[in-house]
From Swiss-Prot:
<keyword id="KW-0812">Transmembrane</keyword>
<dbReference type="GO" id="GO:0030955">
    <property type="term" value="F:potassium ion binding"/>
</dbReference>
<keyword id="KW-0633">Potassium transport</keyword>
<dbReference type="InterPro" id="IPR023299">
    <property type="entry name" value="ATPase_P-typ_cyto_dom_N"/>
</dbReference>
<dbReference type="Pfam" id="PF00690">
    <property type="entry name" value="Cation_ATPase_N"/>
</dbReference>
<feature type="binding site">
    <location>
        <position position="822"/>
    </location>
    <ligand>
        <name>K(+)</name>
    </ligand>
</feature>
<dbReference type="Pfam" id="PF13246">
    <property type="entry name" value="Cation_ATPase"/>
</dbReference>
<dbReference type="GO" id="GO:0005391">
    <property type="term" value="F:P-type sodium:potassium-exchanging transporter activity"/>
</dbReference>
<keyword id="KW-0375">Hydrogen ion transport</keyword>
<feature type="transmembrane region" description="Helical">
    <location>
        <begin position="784"/>
        <end position="803"/>
    </location>
</feature>
<feature type="topological domain" description="Lumenal">
    <location>
        <begin position="804"/>
        <end position="813"/>
    </location>
</feature>
<feature type="binding site">
    <location>
        <position position="797"/>
    </location>
    <ligand>
        <name>K(+)</name>
    </ligand>
</feature>
<dbReference type="InterPro" id="IPR023298">
    <property type="entry name" value="ATPase_P-typ_TM_dom_sf"/>
</dbReference>
<feature type="transmembrane region" description="Helical">
    <location>
        <begin position="814"/>
        <end position="834"/>
    </location>
</feature>
<keyword id="KW-0406">Ion transport</keyword>
<dbReference type="Pfam" id="PF09040">
    <property type="entry name" value="H-K_ATPase_N"/>
</dbReference>
<keyword id="KW-0813">Transport</keyword>
Amino acid sequence: MGKADNYELYSVELGPGPGGDMAAKMSKKKKAGGGGGKRKEKLENMKKEMEINDHQLSVAELEQKYQTSATKGLSARLAAELLLRDGPNALRPPRGTPEYVKFARQLAGGLQCLMWVAAAICLIAFAIQASEGDLTTDDNLYLALALIAVVVVTGCFGYYQEFKSTNIIASFKNLVPQQATVIRDGDKFQINADQLVVGDLVEMKGGDRVPADIRILAAQGCKVDNSSLTGESEPQTRSPECTHESPLETRNIAFFSTMCLEGTAQGLVVNTGDRTIIGRIASLASGVENEKTPIAIEIEHFVDIIAGLAILFGATFFVVAMCIGYTFLRAMVFFMAIVVAYVPEGLLATVTVCLSLTAKRLASKNCVVKNLEAVETLGSTSVICSDKTGTLTQNRMTVSHLWFDNHIHTADTTEDQSGQTFDQSSETWRALCRVLTLCNRAAFKSGQDAVPVPKRIVIGDASETALLKFSELTLGNAMGYRDRFPKVCEIPFNSTNKFQLSIHTLEDPRDPRHLLVMKGAPERVLERCSSILIKGQELPLDEQWREAFQTAYLSLGGLGERVLGFCHLYLSEKDYPPGYAFDVEAMNFPSSGLCFAGLVSMIDPPRATVPDAVLKCRTAGIRVIMVTGDHPITAKAIAASVGIISEGSETVEDIAARLRVPVDQVNRKDARACVINGMQLKDMDPSELVEALRTHPEMVFARTSPQQKLVIVESCQRLGAIVAVTGDGVNDSPALKKADIGVAMGIAGSDAAKNAADMILLDDNFASIVTGVEQGRLIFDNLKKSIAYTLTKNIPELTPYLIYITVSVPLPLGCITILFIELCTDIFPSVSLAYEKAESDIMHLRPRNPKRDRLVNEPLAAYSYFQIGAIQSFAGFTDYFTAMAQEGWFPLLCVGLRPQWEDHHLQDLQDSYGQEWTFGQRLYQQYTCYTVFFISIEMCQIADVLIRKTRRLSAFQQGFFRNRILVIAIVFQVCIGCFLCYCPGMPNIFNFMPIRFQWWLVPMPFGLLIFVYDEIRKLGVRCCPGSWWDQELYY
């Protein structure tokens, strides 16, 4: 049934009734396993229901419990004592992390620690060599300083990004009302809201925020907006009556920080500050620990591999060096050199810059990223848990269907509502429109004539706002039309009568009759009618028309829409002459025998772009789950309209209805879709929820509490999913914080949701998430290419030391030279790969599996190290031996030459031609070899960056010049190489020497070989999917 027949507060239960709660069970399970601690135990306890019974107590019992008076309030003395005992009515901020600790964390990550160790070794080597008067001591000093600079600069960049994020608790503090009207000792006055205590008697009116959790004692037409707390778009009635055993569903409790829309109310404060529901949510959100992002896990995994290999090879070289007679100091220098060669010093900067670039790209598309690592996480997302109100929907009630003249007509629910197509010539329609316009207390805020009708601000509740805007769009000047029918009497809507009635004089001064109009719950309105208006004629309301009404009502209610009935009655001049004194207390006018005009249904409609966005998510293998505090029928209807429940999918209830069998006789695995409400979720075992998520691909959770949203996210994560949570309300903030990535709405989103989220959609458009997913997948793809490019040169940087120790040739490559490769020439091409376009439709691929699809996997390492890296090593040694031979040192003579070459006292070492070389001349030649090997690596790296443009498609298909940043980076790389080679002063500072032009040409055939070799690899991958070739060579 639709929601017109009841104006109940939907459940936001925090946990269990007598049967216990899923969060509580999970808490017990975790404790039994030995995990937890006080922080976790406290967090789990927050997921339990607020154990209060104030809503069930009589006024006298409340007075006794809180030592207060329902008429005079607390005494000032007792209020002061309670304030001293309980503290102010404010949210307690959590202990913040000191800024120096945040900065220190940026300097102490896995890769940073490895670089600190390398820098320390360099400093130790420099100190020892300096004490011995070694001529090459400056190398190690420069190397140490460069490594420290890299760590500090990248740490400062990361700290700056973190510094821009705001503390989550600040948004909740913004929700605290400034003033509250309180009665103490019988005197009414205003105080700061943070001075309220339990037992205070307070008053509130339309436009006020509820200053605490309040037990309602008296109310007149009071309605509150719980959308920021529960996710519902409809206003909720507040009254003194206890309507539900749960304190969170009864109408006689008003929640702290919710907005009072209209009417007045008086009540007793029963909870303040952190003990209120909003306080518990604030504690829950700030208590949820930040989970590591997938990209952080991937980088840690990569660092572990690199650190292990660096230490393994470094220790091996150290032992070998000691065994063959090197001193401890020289062996430590080898160890340090291997670490420096293996640690990709530029990777830290590369990853940070790549993520920043993509974040800026997303910002241009209305996606603001607060946490850089969240960029890639969104691309890894396999499940999106989306709030309904304001995220999938427009967060405004809109007239969607009308039933008059025995036909259901569809209204336009798009953002501009400009396409009303139903017949507006019928006399019945005119009568219905007259009733819905006059029987309406909502009004436009003045000064909005130039504002489009759907965007105008209206003073009134959501339903009446929808009716007023609909009337304005169809009639024209609705407020002017209303003025032509002056109101003389009114009965506001209340939960007992469930109708609103008003009496008006007619616009024609010659017609002295009065017009009575009524709207309300359809069945309540119909029972007061004796006739029905059909095509302008009043017909008896017989059984046939009652069945027609029931059919239409069930049809609209089944769509999850809120349905209202409308009727009217012309009061005769004889019985109700002009100036007649209508009395709403005495009811001296008829309220039965009315004429039924029709039905109007309203819904918070989906955004126009959402269905297509959901379809794209489905195509990309991403599961969209709706999690809302709204009614199950409404949630299911919206889910079906946007494609979360696809066409033809059935729930267990749908199958039972189709087969006409009880629900318990249906195999749940036959149902593709499933709708679970909060009460059902509360009684489910954790394993049952996980099984439901595994069994039903299409899931909708309705009437859920903030804590249950958190449990749902945790259950999805237990299935191995990377979970994104979208939302805009306060109720969403704990789940936003817990999720792998939280996505908040920028326009309608609360400050709490924005601060809890990792990403903010500035246009509140769910469809923008699809853009984020695509960019996230692209950044992972490009990071993979960048890392593959970065790793390749590790082999040509490592093998010179291997040959140096094992074959005893003069050292081909110096540590400072390696650092220039890492931080100067190669960082620009590496970063430029972040600008590379997607090589195929990545939105047709399934999300990556974090356990299988690693950033650095075996095929990538094998291909980079042992294939492309090996070719680059051959190129380097070819160029090295060429340069040595042209200066008189043939390859065979170089073997075993190292001891004599490095002997400071030997000043007449003969080359292959018999020429004698001093130590200074030999050192000059060694620096020349450093430069030659450096240039060889750089020439091969140009070919390497070109092949890294794609992993599967041919480079010719991708295009060589589409990525202009990469072309510029290659040119810049060559310019830096020339500068280092030919700039005066370089030999004395960084050990770079001018080299002959032909030595630049030696590595070029190897670069061509790299390109051709990779094109053959890609051809095999494309032609033989699933084959050994594909599995081993596709990284």
